[in-house]
């Protein structure tokens, strides 16, 4: 399972997120998108070497996140189970009468050649 898919299941969980600039954010996840952008509510944000700031909501760009600190009570074994079965990729079926090759009609021709005899 991809990390982002796991994080998307963490809605309504209270977590601490450490950012790459050293800021720590503690809040309840309202959503995570495929770019790992994380949206939180009831947030306490502590900038490095500063006093904590209370915020109602906060959105964090995914590439600014260093790591998530998850609560110990989180049932990881149930969250990590892959609910969606993996879809096996089907081989493309050959187009009727065309075979598997590309044929002669592809490409840009053979160029001007190397100076052979002219016609």
Swiss-Prot record:
SMART domains, A to Z: Sm
GO biological process, one term: 7-methylguanosine cap hypermethylation
GO cellular component, as recorded: catalytic step 2 spliceosome; commitment complex; cytosol; methylosome; nucleoplasm; nucleus; pICln-Sm protein complex; precatalytic spliceosome
Occurrences of domain Sm (ranges): 2-74
Coiled coil (UniProt feature): none
Result when mutating residue 58 to K: Loss of interaction with CLNS1A
Ranges of Basic residues composition bias in the record: 99-119
Record keywords, A-Z: Cytoplasm, Isopeptide bond, Methylation, mRNA processing, mRNA splicing, Nucleus, Repeat, Ribonucleoprotein, Spliceosome, Ubl conjugation
Compartment list: Cytoplasm, Cytosol; Nucleus
Crosslinked positions (Glycyl lysine isopeptide (Lys-Gly) (interchain with G-Cter in SUMO2)): 86
Processing and modification events after translation: Methylated on arginine residues by PRMT5 and PRMT7; probable asymmetric dimethylation which is required for assembly and biogenesis of snRNPs.
Residue span of region Disordered: 88-119
Any GO MF annotation of the entry: U1 snRNP binding
UniProt region (Required for interaction with SMN1), positions on chain: 69-119
Chain positions covered by the region annotation Sufficient for interaction with CLNS1A: 1-80
SUPFAM superfamilies in alphabetical order: Sm-like ribonucleoproteins (SSF50182)
A Pfam cross-reference name: LSM
Function: Plays a role in pre-mRNA splicing as a core component of the spliceosomal U1, U2, U4 and U5 small nuclear ribonucleoproteins (snRNPs), the building blocks of the spliceosome. Component of both the pre-catalytic spliceosome B complex and activated spliceosome C complexes. As a component of the minor spliceosome, involved in the splicing of U12-type introns in pre-mRNAs. May act as a charged protein scaffold to promote snRNP assembly or strengthen snRNP-snRNP interactions through non-specific electrostatic contacts with RNA.
Record-stated family: Belongs to the snRNP core protein family.
Oligomer and partners: Core component of the spliceosomal U1, U2, U4 and U5 small nuclear ribonucleoproteins (snRNPs), the building blocks of the spliceosome. Most spliceosomal snRNPs contain a common set of Sm proteins, SNRPB, SNRPD1, SNRPD2, SNRPD3, SNRPE, SNRPF and SNRPG that assemble in a heptameric protein ring on the Sm site of the small nuclear RNA to form the core snRNP. Component of the U1 snRNP. The U1 snRNP is composed of the U1 snRNA and the 7 core Sm proteins SNRPB, SNRPD1, SNRPD2, SNRPD3, SNRPE, SNRPF and SNRPG, and at least three U1 snRNP-specific proteins SNRNP70/U1-70K, SNRPA/U1-A and SNRPC/U1-C.
Miscellaneous field: In the autoimmune disease systemic lupus erythematosus, antinuclear antibodies are developed with Sm specificity.
Protein name: Small nuclear ribonucleoprotein Sm D1
């Amino acid at each position: 399972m991809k990390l982002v898919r796991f994080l998307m299941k963490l809605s309504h969980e209270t977590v601490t997120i450490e950012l790459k600039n050293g800021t720590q954010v503690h809040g309840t996840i309202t959503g995570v998108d495929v770019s790992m952008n994380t949206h939180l509510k009831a947030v306490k944000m502590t900038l490095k070497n500063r006093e904590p700031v209370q915020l109602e909501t906060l959105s964090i760009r995914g590439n600014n996140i260093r790591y998530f600190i998850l609560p110990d009570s989180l049932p990881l074994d149930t969250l990590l189970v892959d609910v969606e079965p993996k879809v096996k990729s089907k081989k493309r079926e050959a187009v009727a009468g065309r075979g598997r090759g590309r044929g002669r009609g592809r490409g840009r021709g053979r160029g001007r050649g190397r100076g052979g005899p002219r016609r």
